[in-house]
Amino acid sequence: MSSPDTPVCASPQQMEMYNSHFYTCALFFNLLIAFTSMTLIIMAIRKLLTESIINTSTRMFLIVGLLCCSLHQTAYIVLRVQVIFQILFKLDQPCKLYYKAYDCKYVTFSLVAGNTGMIFIQSAMTIDRILTTVFTNLWPKLKYWPGVILSSFMIGCNFTNVQFIFWNDPLTDYVPTCGQFPPKSVGRFQKFLEIALYMSLAHMVINVIILYINVVQDRRQRLVSTHDQSQSFDVNQRFQSRVALKSTQAIFFLSMSQFLSCFLYTIFTKLYLTLQPDMTPLQSGLTLALTYTTPYACIAIPSLIMVTLTFIRNQRHRSINALRSQTETGDQYMQKIKKIWDK
């Protein structure tokens, strides 16, 4: 970093980082992780679009969350390709290795928007589960509208938040890579990281409560199906109860993973920003390249979504088979009553 309008030459310590084979290997490893995550994101989105085993709004939230991942990973790929290009073709020009922060704004904004977007979409999923639990019969009938409205609102919140983080920052400093956070915006970014951690913790607590409520509702429906084998047994209500429970379990599981991702990202970023001044450029570069958590989260989240969808599908098949058995038992019971009446 440097003062405005003054081009910066890389220091000998900076050149040590660029010439390090370990650092170069770490950059290619980052690219491998990023391209792998993009492949998994595409697979997960395709699975969400083709398998309607969870409600439409939940699928929409998951897709928007994956798009936030892809936004981050696209910017991350551009960032890593820039550094690799510097290493391969510009090491003989040490005074042309730094970037003006303004020229990096789209990459930096995309990295931040991808991270914060995943947090805001987590809020949308939590709100959706609350309303689904409160309005058990009404909410599923709204189909995709809750997803459209809540996703649009959270995207707006995310855009506003990113603008606030970089508010009044002229972006005139020079940075060694486009992943380097502009110094005038670091304070607001760290403040948001603290808020994001509390948000994720609140999501976890709320989802635990919702999961408990859905378990109670499902047990009540089971009790009805066990003691009422007549035509008054509402198969649709029983099925909706099971779907709500399994969807809540799935969202709870995904929220757990996202909470862990947010927690690790927050802790890592705060530690990194605190310790970075005492690190050499090589130590700082290797630490960021190997332990930055978001690329790993963007591999884990689509993988968990695909595993969870498979789990829900299998559970739904079991629930349908169980309900069919219960319906047949009820029909047999009514046939017995009819035979007795005809005698």
From Swiss-Prot:
Which terms are listed as keywords in the entry?
Membrane, Olfaction, Receptor, Sensory transduction, Transmembrane, Transmembrane helix
GO CC, alphabetical: membrane
Topology with respect to the bilayer: Multi-pass membrane protein
Q: Which residues lie on this side of the membrane: Cytoplasmic?
A: 46-60, 128-146, 214-247, 313-343
Q: Which one of the record's GO molecular function terms can you name?
A: G protein-coupled receptor activity
Which intervals lie on the Extracellular side per UniProt?
1-24, 82-106, 168-192, 269-291
Where in the cell is the protein located? Membrane
Return the protein name. Serpentine receptor class alpha-11
